[in-house]
């Protein structure tokens, strides 16, 4: 919840539907703020939320989670808010989406009518208002104290840094940890943009050998994530202890992080890797101004803040970096092959204009070799897998249909320029069933 928010809000009550974010985004697309809350919220809790104009109950016809039937509390219908049912037929609801079947246009029209005609909500949710509100809230929370931020250079942390810089200026201290799992030229670019262009207080730490040493021989994806996350915290802790007067920690949590990390009616998809787990004697109050934004809204926020296009639309990059794209136990030769293949892919996508139309694209190197032929001799080298997906909110994703000549040029370059690779494949798996990342 955005504290003291001034915008009208539609509340989505979660009955275990996997389409909660779809409904939430449909409302936000109308310029009205929406939030997902658990099905067992009380009428008192609901009324305590700011500027609620209506409720959408979202769930399937059976409403069963882990074998237990669930429903909203009866008092919700008497709380004084208009109620719409999505995904099933509720007798006490003013509007029922079930009557429209799979007619998407009719469903959108019904949601629009419910939001504006029934709930009388005002379309005042936009990034200009969001930035103004958050700058005010950050200043109220932080005052004249200092904020520490782990700056990866990705979209989320970059937008967060820009927002914090706007709110508190020189009281923001950024730490960039190069764990050796960055893309080619990534750390150098972070230093150039944030230290030299945005004039942020930036501390750069090269911890490549520390991370790769700890990851040697570790094949399990979740264990790799935990090692990377744990060591990151230790490095971050070391740098934090060198600074005096830090009271707050900036964290780039966004809404999909919250949704995918598990709620009362949702399962954990994978461990997320924002900063956490600092020791008890080094605890900070969190500053998380982006936590209610979907990914496209984070980008829109970056545009509103005046960040460069290449920064706002930088490719999404996981916290563990190439560590979850170098499958299995990480080795330096595969990591280098992966880094070079990724650079080639990004260069060719930019040349073809695909960097402006494809949401995320990257390469993966698995931990097995394939038989091939190089210089008229048998070779036994690594394959490279290309993945390119489009999505709005990272909750679902479709495969980008890349033109054959572009794929062939990428393949030719990878095979010619990386001597340890002899095969290139294209991943055709959407989300679901596959996640966007391989690990």
What are these regions (language model features)?
Residues 2-247, 262-439:
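RNA-binding accessory domains that recognize and position tRNA/RNA substrates
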Residues 251-253:
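Extended catalytic-interface subdomain
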């Amino acid at each position: 919840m955005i504290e003291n928010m001034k915008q009208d809000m539609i509340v989505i009550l979660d009955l275990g539907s996997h389409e909660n974010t779809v409904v939430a985004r449909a409302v936000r697309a109308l310029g009205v703020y929406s939030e997902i809350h658990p099905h067992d919220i009380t009428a008192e809790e609901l009324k305590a939320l700011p500027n609620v104009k209506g409720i959408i109950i979202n769930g399937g016809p059976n409403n069963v989670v882990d074998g237990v039937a669930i429903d909203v509390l009866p008092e919700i219908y008497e709380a004084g808010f208009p109620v719409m049912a999505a995904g099933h037929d509720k007798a006490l609801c003013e509007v029922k989406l079930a009557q429209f079947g799979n007619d998407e246009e009719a469903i959108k029209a019904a949601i629009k009518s419910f939001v504006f005609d029934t709930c009388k909500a005002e379309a005042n949710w936009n990034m200009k208002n969001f930035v103004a509100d958050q700058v005010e809230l950050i200043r109220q929370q932080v005052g004249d104290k200092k904020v520490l931020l782990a700056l990866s250079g990705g979209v989320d942390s970059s937008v967060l840094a820009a927002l914090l810089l706007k709110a508190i200026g020189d009281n923001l201290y950024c730490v960039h940890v190069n764990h050796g799992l960055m893309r080619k030229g990534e750390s150098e670019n972070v230093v150039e943009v944030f230290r030299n262009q945005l004039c942020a207080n930036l501390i750069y730490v090269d911890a490549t050998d520390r991370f790769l040493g700890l990851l040697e021989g570790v094949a399990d994806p979740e264990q790799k994530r935990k090692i990377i996350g744990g060591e990151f915290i230790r490095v971050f802790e070391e740098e934090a202890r060198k600074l005096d007067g830090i009271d707050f920690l900036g964290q780039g949590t966004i809404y999909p992080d919250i949704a995918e990390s598990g709620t009362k009616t949702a399962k954990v998809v994978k461990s997320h890797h924002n900063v956490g787990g600092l020791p008890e004697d080094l605890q900070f109050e969190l500053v998380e101004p982006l936590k209610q934004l979907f990914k496209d809204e984070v980008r829109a926020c970056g545009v509103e803040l005046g960040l460069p296009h290449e920064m706002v639309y930088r490719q999404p990059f996981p916290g563990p970096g190439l560590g979850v794209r170098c499958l299995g136990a990480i080795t330096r030769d595969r990591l280098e092959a992966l880094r070079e293949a990724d650079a080639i892919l990004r260069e060719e996508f930019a040349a073809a204009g695909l960097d402006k139309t494809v949401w995320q694209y990257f390469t993966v190197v698995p931990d097995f070799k394939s038989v091939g032929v190089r210089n008229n001799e048998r070779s036994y080298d690594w394959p490279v897998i290309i993945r390119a997906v489009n999505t709005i909110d990272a909750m679902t994703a479709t495969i980008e249909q890349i033109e054959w000549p572009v794929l062939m040029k990428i393949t030719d370059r990878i095979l010619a320029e990386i001597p340890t690779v002899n095969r290139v494949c294209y991943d055709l798996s959407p989300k679901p069933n596959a996640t966007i990342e391989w690990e």
